[in-house]
Every structure is written in C-alpha cells, then in structure tokens.
Amino acid sequence: FFILYKKTKVTFFSDSAYLCDMSKQNSPLVLGTERISKLLTQYAIPAIIAMTASSLYNMADSIFIGHGVGPLAISGLALTFPLMNLAAAFGSLVGVGASTLVSVKLGQKDYEGANKVLGNVLVLNVVLGLAFTLVFMLLLDPILYFFGASENTISYARDYMNVILIGNVITHMYLGLNAVLRSSGFPKLAMYATLASVVINCVLNPLFIFGFGWGIKGSAWATVISQVISLTGQLIHFSRPKELLHFKKGIYRLKSEIVKGILYIGMSPFLMNLCACLIVILINRGLKEHGGDMAIGAYGIVNRVVFLFIMILSLIHISEPTRLQLI
C-alpha cells in the first residue's frame, strides 16, 4: 500500500491565486476537466475491484473459521452479519455524505471548506464509533439472542463481536477516510487501502486460527489489525502538508452545517443498509425456528457467495463502455 501510494501521482488543473500557492501539492483536481465517461471508469472500477476483493476475503474468512473452529462457529459468524452491516451502515452515513460534500467543495473551489469536511469526518467517526461500541458492548448478548443465537452459537458470536467492537472506532475512521480519499481524486489509492486490508487479513487469519489457536477471536483480531494498518496509510496521506486535503489546525471543530450536510446526504445509504440488516435478522430468526443453527450458517455462506457474484457482474457492467470504445 505504501509503495503503491508513491506511484499514485495525478496532475490537476490550474486556477486562481489559491492554486498558485497550491502548485506543489499533488492532490488531483481532474474532476473539473476530464470527460465524465472516463471519470466513471476511473472511479467505479477501482471501487468495485476493492469490494470484490472484500467479498473474496469474506468467503476465505468463512473457510478458515469452518475448518479451524467448526460449523457452529460459521453459524455464530453469520449471526454477527447484521451487526457488522449496521456498523458499515454508520460508515456509509458519514462516508457517503462526507465524500459528496468534499466533491461539492472542490467543485466550488472552496478548498478550505473541503479541509473542514475532512476534519469533521475524523471527529464524527470517532464519536459515532465510540457510541456504537458502548451501546452494543452493554447489550451484546440480548441483541445476539434477538438475532437468532442459541446456547450453541452465542459464545462464538460473542467472542467475535467483542474483538470487532474493540476496533470499531478504527473501522469507522477507515471507512470514512477511504470515502474522502476517493472523492478527493485518489480512487486507486482508496482501492489499494482496501486491497492491503484484504491481503493482510488473509495472511493473519490462518496464522491466528491455526498457528496460535485463537479460534474465532483470531479471525476478528486479523480483521482489526488489517484495518489499523490500512488506516495508518490513510492517516499518513492526509498528514502530508503538500496534499490539497490534509490535517491541520482549525478543521476539527464540528460545524453544524457540515454535520447536517453529511447526515442528510448519507441518510439514504444508511437506511438501505439498515433495511438489509432487518431482512437478515428476520431470515435468521425464521431459520432458527424451522432449520436450526446449521441453517443459519448455511444462509451466511450463501450470502457471501451471492455478494461476490454481484460485485463481479457490476465490474463487467461498468467496464462495458470502455470495451465498446476500444471496438
């Protein structure tokens, strides 16, 4: 990730006196000059590749847990899906809203405003991440039982989520900054951050599960550690003063207009993810009643396979215009 970062250099269009002062910075502003069709390909394909890689990891994660811990652990892992998806929903709430606001500010040439959005994203993710962690750590067992856990699977789901919740703030920051990274003109760098997380995860998973004998907790720790490493790369990027968007004094105070804008724009993807959580909860409860723990585990595996094929089809679809241009 860090090596690929150094290779991700993009030029930007010249503007007024402000850009003269920013001439040494390498944050791209080609969004204002490049063809929309080309930008669509440049931004959509890296995003879908990253999501496809994440789907592949989720399948590998299930394989490691299934062979290293057992089938009931797969069922316990499946029970955590609504909680994981809910955490992702909060990540989308901030990430989608912030990335849109950053794009708008850059389009308006309000670069100071874009930096304030970056600072608000960091603080807002920490606040929401801590609140999410506190609430669900206090109510974890009742929530898991409501999701369809049984006496046979509750320990696996609890062990996994306890570790994930410890690193939940990291997850929120990672998702939020990756969205801003993409919208500020670095779609490939955002993809590299995700791919780095996936690769590290796949390396640590078998080491922690089979090598150290940590069981399902090992898989959770692999997830948290991989996100910490990717987040470190993002923080290094935004800490570089030569970048157009970078951390500096005066951008971390929450502004009501920025927070409202982020939440308003991000509410739609948040509600979509929330609905997906509710659907999975209802299905898991029905499967527990009529099929038992193994049925919940089987449904969790099917979910991962289906999502992988959705990502592959999306990648084929978005690359179609490019292939037509080549013809």
Regions found by a protein language model. Give the residues of each.
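Signature of the first transmembrane helix
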Residues: 38-99, 103, 267-287
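Hydrophobic/aromatic residues within transmembrane alpha-helices of membrane transport systems
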Residues: 49, 61-65, 77, 102, ...
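Alpha-helical transmembrane segments of multi-pass membrane transporters/permeases
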Residues: 125, 180-203, 217, 221-224
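Hydrophobic residues within alpha-helical transmembrane segments
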Residues: 45, 49, 83, 123, ...
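Small-residue-rich hydrophobic transmembrane alpha-helices
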Residues: 74-134, 171-190, 299-324
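Generic alpha-helical transmembrane segments of integral inner-membrane proteins
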Residues: 48, 52, 56, 60, ...
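Helix-terminus/linker motif at the lipid-water interface of multi-pass membrane proteins
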Residues: 56-75, 144-151, 207-213, 277-308
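Short alpha-helical transmembrane segments in multi-pass integral membrane proteins
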Residues: 2-44, 102-169, 211-266, 320-324
